[in-house]
Amino acid sequence: MSHLQNLLLDTLLGTKHVDSAALIKLQERSLCVASPGFSVMPSDVRTLVNGFAKNPLKTRREGLYFKEKDYKCVRADDYSLYAKNENTGVIVVKTHLYLLVATYSEGMYPSVCVEATEKLGDYLRRKGN
């Protein structure tokens, strides 16, 4: 298991409020690591990368289509996308090299998922990643 995968498992899934997580390489637009059982399809990678490439206001208006679900975007800026669909959601944080993706499901606290994902994103940015 790689250092990056350990980070995902320990800092995100370890909270019990992150259902699944992944790191996407921005330059290659490809999956780097993911939590067990979480697959991110190339179309989903494009959706997330384009969510940052577009004007954040446009992303916020249009929402995201991720993992075969429409999500309402509740935050979109240069570094973060938060989107929800009923009792589930996806949090995406942009670093220099990666998109950090975390999902939460029913019964989990979105605020804990957001906080853990943003903290890991800050850590990766400080490390130059």
From Swiss-Prot:
Similarity comment text for this entry: Belongs to the profilin family.
Keyword Hydrolase part of the UniProt annotation: no
Protein name: Profilin-4
Entry-linked Gene3D superfamilies: Dynein light chain 2a, cytoplasmic (3.30.450.30)
Keywords carried by this UniProt record: Cytoplasm, Developmental protein, Differentiation, Lipid-binding, Spermatogenesis
Domain of life: Eukaryota
Localisation: Cytoplasm
Gene Ontology MF, one: lipid binding
Xref: SMART domains: PROF
Any one Gene Ontology BP term: spermatogenesis
